[in-house]
């Protein structure tokens, strides 16, 4: 049995979010939250929120035991970029891309995963 949670349009670069996500893939939920608590990264806060949501979905919707949950799948997809202009010298302008991410977390029982 598995449960899923998705956070969309998170204002953090997908590349930086993937670095955080790689730390907790395959770990137990409690262990993953402990790792994220001490990860000094903006993406860690967003990933923590999604992992907690997936665990709550598993507990509430599927009556699964929270201690046995494992992060079976976790991945980050690229969302739309916000394009901004940075004025430069001599009337020029540079484009700044504010990247967004979609974070997906799937938790399952230890028996299956």
Curated annotation (Swiss-Prot):
Coiled coil: none annotated. GO terms for biological process: translation. One of its GO terms (molecular function) is rRNA binding. It comes from the Bacteria. SUPFAM superfamilies: Ribosomal protein L22. Gene3D superfamilies: Ribosomal protein L22/L17. Keywords: Ribonucleoprotein, Ribosomal protein, RNA-binding, rRNA-binding. GO terms for cellular component: cytosolic large ribosomal subunit. InterPro entries: Ribosomal_uL22, Ribosomal_uL22_bac/chlpt-type, Ribosomal_uL22_bac/org-type, Ribosomal_uL22_CS, Ribosomal_uL22_sf. Belongs to the universal ribosomal protein uL22 family. NCBIfam families: rplV_bact (TIGR01044). This protein binds specifically to 23S rRNA; its binding is stimulated by other ribosomal proteins, e.g. L4, L17, and L20. It is important during the early stages of 50S assembly. It makes multiple contacts with different domains of the 23S rRNA in the assembled 50S subunit and ribosome. The globular domain of the protein is located near the polypeptide exit tunnel on the outside of the subunit, while an extended beta-hairpin is found that lines the wall of the exit tunnel in the center of the 70S ribosome. Part of the 50S ribosomal subunit. This is Large ribosomal subunit protein uL22. It comes from Desulforamulus reducens (strain ATCC BAA-1160 / DSM 100696 / MI-1) (Desulfotomaculum reducens). The lineage of its organism: Bacteria, Bacillati, Bacillota, Clostridia, Eubacteriales.
């Amino acid at each position: 049995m598995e449960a899923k949670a998705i956070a969309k349009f998170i204002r953090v670069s997908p590349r930086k979010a993937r670095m955080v996500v790689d730390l907790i893939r395959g770990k137990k939920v409690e262990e993953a939250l402990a790792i994220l608590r001490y990860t000094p990264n903006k993406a860690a806060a967003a990933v923590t929120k999604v992992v907690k949501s997936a665990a709550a979905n598993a507990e509430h919707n599927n009556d699964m035991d929270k201690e046995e949950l494992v992060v079976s799948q976790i991945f980050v997809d690229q969302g739309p970029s916000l394009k901004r202009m940075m004025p430069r010298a001599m009337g020029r302008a540079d484009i700044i891309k504010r990247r967004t991410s979609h974070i997906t977390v799937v938790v399952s029982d230890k028996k299956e995963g």
